[in-house]
Structure formats: C-alpha cells, structure tokens
C-alpha cells in the first residue's frame, strides 16, 4: 500500500481517501470513486482512523489533539503506511508486543507442547544463549517444537530442575527390573537358543529323569498283583460272555419273546395275555374304563398296561392299512 515519495498525487489521494473513510463519507470529495464505510471494512481496515476529527487541511496534523479510538491498536498496521507521510499515527504508550514470526491473525498460545527427549537432560540451562523472545515465556527455549493444541502442556510454574529430577528417577526405575519379568526373560533366552544346543541340553535331562524313574519304582507290591489278577479274570469272563451272546444271536431261536433280529422284544406280555388282548381288540378297538378294569383283572395286568397295549395296537393297524392301500395302488398302475 505504501507509495514512493516522488509521486505526491498518489500520496494526497491516499490521505484524502483515509480522511473520507474516517469521517464516514461514502463518496470521495474530488472524484466519483466509492469508498466503503467504516462498518463495511474488516478488522484490519481503517477503523482505527476514526481518530482524526481535526484534520481540515491536507498537510497539517495536530498530534497532541488526536484521540485514540476504542478499537485495539495493532503495531503491524503502522508498518504498511509510508514512513515519510505526515499523516503517520504515533504509537500509543502501551507495553510492546513481542515480534512474532507468524501472522498477527494467528492466536498465540500461552504454553507450548512438551515432548520427552533425551537431549533435555543433557542440556545445561545456564549455557543457553539469550535470543529475542519469539514465543511465550512459558515455552522452554531448548524445545523448538511448534506448539500444538490438544496435547499435554507443562504447567506455567513448573521449573526445569523438577523435570531433570523426574528424568533421573525414570532412569533409576528403568534400571530396576521387577521379579515378575525374570521368568519371561529366562523363557525368551531359552527359546532364543539354537535347536542343536537345545537338544544337547535336553538329552542329559531325559537320561536323569529315566534314572529317577527306575530308582523310584521298586518291586511290585502283593496288593497290586492281586488287583491285576482280578482285572485279568474279569476281562476274560467278559470276553467269554460276549462270545456266548454272539453264538446265541447267530443261532435263530423261534421264541415269541424274541424278534427276528435276535433282540428281546420290548413287550413283556406272555402268549396268553396277548391272545386275550387280541380277542378283545377284534371285538372292540376302543375300551371303556369298566371293561378295561375287567380285562386287566382277568389277564393279571394293570389298567395302564392294557390302555397302552390298545393304543399301540390301533397305531399298528393304521400303519398296516396304509401299507396295504399303497400296495394296491402301485399294483393297479400300469407302467408304459
């Protein structure tokens, strides 16, 4: 924005534009150029120029009668203007802001991010040279890291000696090894051995273990001999019984209690009982309670046994009727 001193027309144009913007005029007085008002301009605009109520002439400025605006003064804005211009605004007597290497719009953080490093313990704080302050006072100079928000930040009143003490304590604690980790380390060392050494180490151990087994096992006691003899006798008897049952199964027995496969029938009824129940079933498939009690007394069975037998007999009859019906249908069909 600064213009050379050799062009007074441009300098006078800029001064008039500043004056008209500060007074709130929307148009420039000598030309038809539009200038925005102070409310339309941003934070770095000429809002700080609302401070020139007594500027009547172009080259005369009374610095004692200037009133400071309510807006905060930024020292960086003064560097934009021409240093030889008579309209240069004097900087108020305020504590000087630190010269930042980053733009003024960036919010300077009060603390900086601290990272653990081995270099911090080695550095001597007295040997640090005095450099101009580019960051906040709370940030240590030996840590050139950029402050990052969202991470752990050191307390403002935290001295450097405490951090050195903590680092020293960390070194001591790292040298001390807990007892619980000794077993793991020994296992890792054993596993890291080559396979040949492992085999060599295992062979003498195996020989010692076998020797111990032979030494510890004396002559067998008489009780153990008796138990083994009884177990052998039981095994031989069970084998004989299995052979007998197999022979019985092989020889077909025409008994009404055994089925064709050789297994015993589930029905515990005798031949006389089944004949009496069959007669009653042919006469009547469904029994009343009184008739069921009479049959149970005559056949020497319980009421529940008679009831179950009749239920099973009805299911059997139903199955037989279904099979005969299917057989008749299949025989009547002609396959072409």
Curated annotation (Swiss-Prot):
GO terms for molecular function: DNA-binding transcription factor activity, RNA polymerase II-specific; RNA polymerase II cis-regulatory region sequence-specific DNA binding. PROSITE patterns: HOMEOBOX_1, HOMEOBOX_2. The keyword Magnesium does not apply. It holds the Pfam family Homeodomain. Residues 262-321 bind DNA. CDD domains: homeodomain. GO terms for cellular component: nucleus. Residues 193-217 are annotated as: Disordered. InterPro entries: HD (IPR001356), HD_metazoa (IPR020479), Homeobox_CS (IPR017970), Homeodomain-like_sf (IPR009057), HXA10/ABDB-like (IPR046333). It is found in: Nucleus. Keywords: Developmental protein, DNA-binding, Homeobox, Nucleus, Transcription, Transcription regulation. Sequence-specific transcription factor which is part of a developmental regulatory system that provides cells with specific positional identities on the anterior-posterior axis. Belongs to the Abd-B homeobox family. This is Homeobox protein Hox-D10. It comes from Heterodontus francisci (Horn shark). The lineage of its organism: Eukaryota, Metazoa, Chordata, Craniata, Vertebrata.
